[in-house]
């Protein structure tokens, strides 16, 4: 009596190598269900191998630094430089050496449906996490570039008192005035796993803040657009005027502030 397709599927779930003899054995099974299960598992293993290779490549900066003797490498990234409303948020994350989190990538490349899951995975595995938040008023005072630096410095400061302190910083396209060895990496959130971890922490943190603001200031679509200048947001500005969280140094908000007819 042949093995049931259900039992074969269960056996295949335990297979992690494309060279496993079970694949060769099942290749001669003419049942359509078996062949579908076989191809499905092979495809899944190929995807896992590709993901492992991608994650390994994203650890290249970290591995080079480990060889130099650095022990606690912090990735730093920000979210929210472009929106018309809300804060700029930065995160500083130290992952364990050689830590890999499946699906972790530049937060802009991660499907929104997976943000929370990967964010929680980072929180569980990280040795230390710091978050820096600079509100719209300070952004208007110092400009968004300087505000981004301040948010990153605050994120690093938030690590004070935690067990693990950074001895090296990998920063997404920014150089900070701080006495810690560092490297600025262009498109760092797509090339360094540590920076990618900071990217998703900053993204989820800011999105949660904007969802809360959406309840306080309805009509602008903050929960969906995170403060960016979407059609709904611009329509809200025309209908209801600016809110206390809008950036008055950003257009078209800046022009509306000078318009005495603005509600």
UniProtKB/Swiss-Prot annotation:
> Which cofactors does this protein require?
Mn(2+); Mg(2+)
Residues that bind a divalent metal cation? 77-78, 172
Q: Which domain of life is it from?
A: Bacteria
Q: Does the keyword Coiled coil apply?
A: no
Q: Read off the SUPFAM superfamilies from this record.
A: Ribonuclease H-like
Q: Which InterPro entries match?
A: RNase_HII, RNase_HII/HIII, RNase_HII/HIII_dom, RNaseH-like_sf, RNaseH_sf
Catalytic activity entry = Endonucleolytic cleavage to 5'-phosphomonoester
Entry's localization field: Cytoplasm
EC number(s) for this protein?
3.1.26.4
Q: Which UniProt keywords apply?
A: Cytoplasm, Endonuclease, Hydrolase, Manganese, Metal-binding, Nuclease
Q: Which Pfam families match?
A: RNase_HII
Give the GO cellular component terms, alphabetically.
cytoplasm; ribonuclease H2 complex
Describe cofactor binding as the record notes it.
Manganese or magnesium. Binds 1 divalent metal ion per monomer in the absence of substrate. May bind a second metal ion after substrate binding.
Q: CDD domains this protein is in?
A: RNase_HII_bacteria_HII_like
Which PROSITE patterns is this protein grouped with? RNASE_H_2 (PS51975)
| One Gene Ontology term of the molecular function aspect | RNA binding
Going by the record, the broad EC class of this enzyme is hydrolase
Q: Which residues form the RNase H type-2 domain?
A: 71-262
User: Which Gene3D superfamilies does the record cross-reference, listed alphabetically?
Assistant: Ribonuclease H-like superfamily/Ribonuclease H
GO aspect biological process, one term: mismatch repair
User: Which family would the database say this protein is a member of?
Assistant: Belongs to the RNase HII family.
Q: What is this protein's function per UniProt?
A: Endonuclease that specifically degrades the RNA of RNA-DNA hybrids.
Name by which UniProt lists this protein: Ribonuclease HII
Species name = Streptococcus pyogenes serotype M5 (strain Manfredo)
């Amino acid at each position: 009596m042949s093995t049931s397709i259900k039992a074969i599927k269960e056996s295949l779930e335990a297979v992690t190598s494309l060279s496993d003899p079970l694949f060769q054995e099942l290749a001669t099974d003419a049942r359509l269900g078996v062949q579908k299960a076989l191809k499905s598992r092979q495809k899944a293993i190929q995807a896992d191998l590709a993901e492992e290779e991608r994650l390994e490549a994203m650890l290249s900066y970290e591995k080079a630094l480990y060889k130099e003797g650095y022990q606690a490498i912090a990735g730093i990234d920000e979210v929210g430089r472009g929106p018309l409303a809300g804060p700029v948020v930065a995160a500083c994350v130290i992952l364990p050496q050689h830590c890999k989190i499946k699906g972790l990538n530049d937060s802009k490349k991660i499907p929104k449906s997976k943000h929370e899951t990967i964010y929680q995975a980072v929180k569980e595995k990280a040795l230390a996490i710091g978050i820096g938040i600079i509100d719209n008023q300070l952004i208007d005072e110092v400009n968004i570039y300087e505000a981004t630096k301040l948010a990153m410095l605050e994120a690093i400061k938030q690590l004070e008192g935690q067990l693990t302190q950074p001895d090296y910083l990998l920063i997404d396209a920014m150089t900070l005035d701080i006495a810690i060895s560092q490297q600025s990496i262009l498109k760092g959130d797509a090339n360094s796993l540590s920076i990618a971890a900071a990217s998703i922490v900053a993204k989820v943190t800011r999105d949660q803040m904007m969802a809360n603001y959406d309840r306080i200031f309805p009509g602008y679509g903050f929960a969906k657009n995170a403060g960016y200048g979407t059609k709904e947001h611009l329509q809200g500005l025309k209908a209801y005027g600016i809110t206390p969280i809008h950036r008055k140094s950003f257009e078209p908000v800046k022009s509306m502030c000078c318009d005495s007819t603005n509600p």
